[in-house]
Every structure is written in structure tokens, then in C-alpha cells.
């Protein structure tokens, strides 16, 4: 069975209750299914806390974090360090054998600079599946942070939705984007069960989909097109539904190519 990538986002990394629910769902799923799982994560809340503690400004452009050269080390420490190891600690607590990685390990995802105006922000492209496939074949849960590296050795902060998309293309995997919201909401706050590119463009034009959700929807649309299969956006809050979601039952918004 093809692997499943679960991209973690929102305040999940900041909530012990959310992490407990997630890892309990992962344990339950792994006990009854053979499907290999991969976690990809960002950690914006971890970065924001660190930046605030250091009195550094947080600047975003089109939903993407501007990352100056003097901040990439801090952001790498927060994402590939604190956020990644926090997830590994929760996996250990739940007796799941896991391995912490960043996008550059084994050239799993290739990264180039996205835009000079954004600084050390990377564009992710599919890379080599060898390392992660080897880990999956041996029963490990790879936990991959959204820090990448260019061919000339520059560390890059990559939007985690886009990183997960590139890794899904690398592995031929299905993709779920887990966030704080139960999916994409319409103008009345109701969940939209299915979303096409034309519907997304309409809601963006109407100002209903804004900011970071635009990045998330576009990443999901890109993923659906690249993978040739639907991509799910859903919430981690409904833990009892997560095993069904991991098995292909939509509980949030299903993005169609």
C-alpha cells in the first residue's frame, strides 16, 4: 500500500492534549493497518514564541514567513530542533520507533530559494525516495521538519504544506494536511466537503479564503494535481475520526485535482 503523509500544522505542537490525541490515533491505526506513515511538520507557533522571546520581528508576505539570513539559524533550531524532537519524544512515549529528519536528509526533497525578497525561504521539489523508503521498510516512522538545504549549502525555511506536497510526490504517497480548522469553511463558517480549483479561486476572489489558508489550499491543489489524486484538509481536534481519515474516509475538505 502506498505511504500516507500526515502534515501537522497549527497550534498542535503547542497543545499536549492535541499531541496525546494524535499519537493515540497513530498507535490505534498502526495496530490495525500495515500502511506506512510519514509525518511532516512546520512549527510556526514554536518559531513565533522564540522570536518573541528574542524580541525579533515576525514579518509575513502572502502567508509566507520572511526569513532574513540572521534568523535562519534560529528558525532551523526551532523547527528541526525543538519542534522535531518534541514529536519524537511523543512517539517514544507511545512506543513508536521514529526517526527525525529534515528535507535535505538523503536528498529526500530538493530545495531552491523561492524569492530573494523572502530571504531564506525555499521552494520544494521532489527528490530521492531511497532513505525514507528504507526507514519505512524497517518499520520506522519518519518525522520530517520543513527545513531544507540548497545545492550550495544554504539552509531554507520551507512552507510545511509545500514541503509535504513535494515529499508526497517523491514517495508516491497520499497526503493529509492536518490543521486547527475542520477543513475549508464557506462564508457562513460551514465546512465545504469538496473543493475544486475553480471553487477555490472563486472563494479567494470573494475574500472568504485568506492569508495562510490561501497557501494551504494552493498547496493542496498543487499536491492533488502533482499526485493525480485527492488531498484532504482536516482537523486534528476530532481524534476519534483520525484512524478513519488515515484509511481514506474524508472528514474535512477533500481537494480534487
From Swiss-Prot:
Q: What Pfam families does the record point to?
A: AA_kinase
> Mind telling me which PANTHER family this protein's record contains?
N-ACETYLGLUTAMATE SYNTHASE (PTHR23342), N-ACETYLGLUTAMATE SYNTHASE, MITOCHONDRIAL (PTHR23342:SF0)
Q: Where does ATP bind?
A: 180-185, 208-210
Any one GO biological process: arginine biosynthetic process via ornithine
This chain's source organism reads Salmonella newport (strain SL254)
Which residues make up the annotated site Transition state stabilizer?
7, 216
Keyword Kinase attached: yes
Name it.
Acetylglutamate kinase
Keywords linked to the UniProt accession: Amino-acid biosynthesis, Arginine biosynthesis, ATP-binding, Cytoplasm, Kinase, Nucleotide-binding, Transferase
Q: Please list the reactions this protein catalyses.
A: N-acetyl-L-glutamate + ATP = N-acetyl-L-glutamyl 5-phosphate + ADP
Protein location:
Cytoplasm
Principal subcellular localisation of the protein: cytoplasm
Function comment: Catalyzes the ATP-dependent phosphorylation of N-acetyl-L-glutamate.
Pathway stated in the Swiss-Prot or TrEMBL entry: Amino-acid biosynthesis; L-arginine biosynthesis; N(2)-acetyl-L-ornithine from L-glutamate: step 2/4
EC number annotated for this UniProt entry: 2.7.2.8
Family matches, as CDD domains: AAK_NAGK-NC (cd04249)
Cellular component GO terms, alphabetically? cytoplasm
Record text on subunit structure and interactions? Homodimer.
List the molecular function annotations (GO) for this entry.
acetylglutamate kinase activity; ATP binding
**InterPro entries in the record, alphabetically?**
AceGlu_kinase-like_sf (IPR036393), AcgluKinase_fam (IPR004662), ArgB (IPR037528), Asp/Glu/Uridylate_kinase (IPR001048), NAGK-NC (IPR041731)
Q: Where does substrate bind?
A: 43-44, 65, 157
Q: Which family does it belong to?
A: Belongs to the acetylglutamate kinase family. ArgB subfamily.
